[in-house]
Amino acid sequence: MVDLFAALGFRWDREKIPHVMPMHSLERVTFHFHRMMTTYVWDASVLEGNPFTFPEVKTLLEGVTVGGRKISDQEQVLNLAESSKQLLALVKGGKFKLDKSTFTQLHGLVAKNEALEWGHFRGEGSETNYTPDVGLGPEGRYTPLPTLAGAPELNRVFSNGLQALDQNVESAFEKAAVFFLFGALQQFFFDGNKRTSRFMMNGILMSAGIDAISIPAAKAQDFNEKMVRFYMKKDATEMMAFLIACHPDAVIIQQNNT
């Protein structure tokens, strides 16, 4: 049996994970995701500091370009939209899997033309020396595992992490939330780690009949502050509670688990 916390690189209070989650049909959760896609894309773009407004995102997703905005900001929004559509197609078709292939496939859409390289782990492409870090404001910087040719350590950590989740975590919500934070902490890619890992989180949730989670734009600062503490302390308890609070059924979840 693989030690869960050791394999993932962080811990959390498992007693605080909700045991009862509102469940729906696959058709229902994918319809909800489709209906809310513009909001999800805008929320995710705001977390990245993208200046596009909600009406501008809506216009762009309708196929109309928005004047006065940087090409890079526009492409980031469009990448988020394409990633959302691909995730939806995978879940609806029963083809979503919690594996490296799906993870890198989604990253190839999320970070296209934005990350140094996209669609594979750090070290699996031509860049084998640069190791990115995560800015933590006044707390300094968080540096993940170094980039090595062929990504042997990142692949080992990823494989062990998935094995630990498979052996120790039955709850779809817990597995989904933990994978998001696992991807954010280990930084398997040069950029777009949190975005891609949240897509994986929502793929796990929707495949289990649970509505997807979006971090509201209004909670961007709160999200960033809590993520800094997560990187510093390697304790995900606070972030788990935050993700529950961001779930569309948050009130019902709280009522059912008290």
PLM feature spans:
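FIC/Doc superfamily catalytic core
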Residues: 1-258
